[in-house]
């Protein structure tokens, strides 16, 4: 290896890491109680969402949820790559993020906030309360249970990120709704 690893060397390291991750997942995670909890968290919230989501506003809710999901997955991937945190267990071995939270829990909870708190003021305060619950109650609990390890990250940073992510997502959806409304009235 020269001063910097070559693309081939980086590809080989990535291959070895993926192989090790799969071997660990098969030997340690798959079928464990923590794995089953994550499977349930990946599936069950969708039933809750289906029951409580206002189907008359499905397009806005789905757009909002997808935007939150994109933010969550992107930020989670970035934090993992920068070694800010680590997930010792996940539903699928190839994903280094907490799939159940990224694809289900956060988008669904935020979508329900968007639906039930329609004004900016009510949404903001509901978002602050939810961010506090996620950051200072749920995250420490999942650290204690071994689902999540903080490396160079804090619960306060999570708190701020949840709030910014929710506000940006709402702003984007409202911006699209305003554009649509302006262009639909002759």
State what each model feature region is.
Residues 1-186:
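Aromatic-rich, lipid-facing transmembrane alpha helices and their immediate juxtamembrane interface loops
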């Amino acid at each position: 290896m020269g001063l910097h690893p070559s693309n081939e060397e980086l590809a080989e390291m990535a291959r070895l890491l993926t192989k090790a991750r799969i071997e660990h997942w098969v030997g340690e995670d798959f079928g464990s109680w923590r794995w089953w909890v994550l499977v349930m968290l990946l599936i069950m919230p969708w039933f809750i969402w289906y029951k409580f989501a206002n189907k008359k506003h499905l397009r806005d809710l789905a757009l909002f949820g997808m935007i939150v999901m994109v933010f969550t997955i992107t930020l989670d991937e970035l934090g993992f790559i920068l070694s800010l945190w680590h997930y010792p267990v996940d539903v699928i071995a190839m994903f280094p993020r907490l799939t159940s939270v990224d694809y289900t829990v956060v988008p669904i909870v935020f979508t329900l906030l968007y639906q039930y708190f329609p004004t900016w003021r009510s949404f903001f305060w509901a978002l602050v309360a939810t961010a506090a619950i996620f950051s200072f109650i749920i995250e420490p609990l999942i650290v204690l249970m071994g689902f999540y390890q903080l490396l160079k990250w804090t619960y306060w940073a999570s708190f701020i990120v949840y709030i910014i992510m929710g506000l940006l997502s709402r702003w984007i959806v409202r911006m699209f709704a305003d554009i649509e409304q302006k262009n639909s009235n002759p």
